[in-house]
Amino acid sequence: MLKNIRSYFYNLKKYQTPLEKYVFPVILLLFPLIGANAGLDITDTTYSLGNYQYLDTVNQMWLFSTFLSNKAGQLIMMLPGAGTMLGFNIWCSFITSAMALVSYYFLKRFMPGWMIFIGEFIAQALCFSPRGILYNYLTYLFLTMGTIFLIAGLFAIERQNLYLIIAGVFLGMNVMVRFPNLAEASLILIVWFYGRITRDKLTEVLKKTGLCILGYVCGFGVVFLGTCVGYGGPDAYIGGIAELLGMTKGASDYTSGGMLGAILEAYGTSLSHMLIVLPCIVAGVIMFLLLPGRYVWVKKFLYMAGLLVLVRFFFARGVFTRNYYYYDCMFQAAMMFVIVGIIFCTVGSLGILNGSRQEQTLAFTALMLILVTPLGSNNYTFPILNNLFLIAPIILWLFRRLMQRMGDEDWNFPWQSFVTTVIIVLFIQGALFHINFSFYDGADGTPRDARLDIPKVSSMVTTSYNAETLTDLYSALGDNELLEDKVLLFGTVPGLAYIFDLEPAIDTTWPDLDSYYYMNFDSELLGLDTAGETPTVILGKDSPDISSDKSKYDTLMDFIDNHDYNIVFESDRFIVFASK
C-alpha cells in the first residue's frame, strides 16, 4: 500500500515546495475568519464580551480566575474596529491563525509541510469555542507556545537554557489566563521523559527542571505582582481564587470527580462505537492472509467497500451526522482520531518505531497534551478538539511512521485503511462544521439569514427569530428611555449587556449560573436596596436555570415586588421590569 501511495503522489512532488511555502500558510491564516459574522448568541459568547467591556464591575472570582484573558479582551476592544462584535471576532480569529502557523513552521523541522497542513487544517476546523472566549484561546495559545519552547529547549544545542525558561514563562502566565491551567505544570514530565531516554545525568535533568520552574515562577509572579499593584495587595487575588475553589459546593460538574467522570464518559462512549471496527479489521487481515499475493486489488476493493458500508452505518446510527450546525457531526470522528492517536503516541513513546529520540519525545508530548488539556474543564473532551495544533500533525506523522515500520505486507491494509478513513471523514466533517457552525445560534439548522439594526451587532447574521425578538426588546428599551440605565439580567441572557451597551447593576450579568453563589446574589441585591438603586430588570423566559435555582429567582421577585417595579415590555422570550 505504501508503495502505491508514494508512486501516486510522486508526480505532485514539484508542487510541494510552493504549496508549503506560500499556499498552505495563507490558508491557515485566513481559514479561521470563516464564520466571524455568523451567529448572535446571547449566552457564553456575548457574556465574555460583556465582561471585557464592563470589567470594572465583574466579581473578583471571575476577574482573577481568568485575569489575563479578561485584560486581553479589554485591550483588544481598543483596537481598530473591535468596538463591534464582528471586528472583535476578526481580531480574535487571528489567535487561531497564530497557533496554526507557529505550529506549522516549528514542526517543519521534523515532518513534511503537507502533512502538517492537514493536521493544522483539522485543528482549525474543529475549533468549536466562540472565538471571543479568550480564556480558552489564550490558554491554547500559551500552552502551544510553552510546549514548543519546551521541545526546542530539549533539542537545542545553543540557547537551551533560554528556551526552557521561556517555556516556563508561558506556562506560568497561563495560570493567570485561567487558574485551572495549573494542571499544565505536569508537562515537566516531558523533560524527565527526555532525560530518561537520552540517559542524561540526574544533575542535568534537575538543571533543566529548575530552569523551567524559574520561568514558571517568573511568568506567574510578574502578572500576580501586577494584580497586587492594581488591586491593592494580594488579598483580592487570593480571595477570588479561594471563592473559585469553593465553587464546587454549588456546581457538582466542577468537582474533580465530576470533571474526570465526564472525560472518561466521553472516551467510553467513543470506544463503544469503535468496538464494531475490531472484528472488521480482524476479518480483513484474515482475508488478506488467505491466498497471499493473489487477488490483492479485489480484496482491497472489497474491504474499502466494507468501510464505506461502515461509514454509512455510523451515519445511520447517529455516530456521524449531517447536522453541520452542531457538534455531533464531527465529535465522534474526532474522538476516534484522538483514540487512535493515543495508541500511536504510546507506541511512538515506547520506541517501538525505532525512531529518533526526538520522535519519541514528540510522541510523548502529544500524549501529554491529550491527557492534560481537558483537566480543569467540565466540557468532556471538547477542549482536546479545540487544541489539536501540535497533536494532530504529530498523530499523522506517527501514522506514517508506523506504516513504514510495519512494511508493505498486504495484511496491513485493513488497519491502515480504517485510520485513513477516519482522517478523511474528520477532514470533511470538520470543514463543513467550521463553515456552518455558530455557537448555539441556529444549532437546530434554522437558517441564519437576518441582521439587526443594533449598531454593535449590525454585521452579524442570525436567525429571524433571534433578530426579531432582540430588535423588539431593543425598541422597547428605547421607547421607555431605559438604554442609559443600569441593568440586572436574569435567566440566561447575560449577553444583552454587551449587545445593548447596558452597564451591569451588580457584579455579574449571569447570576443564575450555578457557579455564582446565592449569598453573592443576595448581597448584591441588598447593596442595591441600601443605595436606593432600581436598575432595569430583564428576565429571560425560556431559561432552564430559573426552575433549577428557585432561591435566586424568588429573591429577585421579592426585590421587584418591594421596589414598585412594573412590566413595561413582555414577549414570548423576555420580560422587562422598570421602576419609573
Predicted regions span which residues?
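Short periplasmic/luminal acceptor-recognition loop of GT-C membrane glycosyltransferases, typified by
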Residues: A431-D514, T534-I546, D572-R573, F577
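Short hydrophobic alpha-helices at membrane interfaces in multi-pass membrane enzymes
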Residues: F149-M173, L202-L211, E359-A366
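Transmembrane-helix motifs of polytopic, lipid-linked glycan transferases
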Residues: I90-P112, M287-L289
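Membrane-interface alpha helices of multi-pass inner-membrane proteins
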Residues: L126-F128, L162-I190, L214, C218, ...
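Extracytoplasmic catalytic/substrate-binding loops of multi-pass membrane glycan-assembly enzymes
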Residues: I34-N51, Q60-I76, A82-G83, G230-D235, ...
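Perimembrane helix-loop-helix junctions
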Residues: N4, E184-G221, L225
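Transmembrane-helix signature of polytopic, membrane-embedded enzymes
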Residues: S103-A125, L162
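Short acidic/glycine- and proline-prone juxtamembrane loop motifs at membrane-interface regions
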Residues: R131-Y140
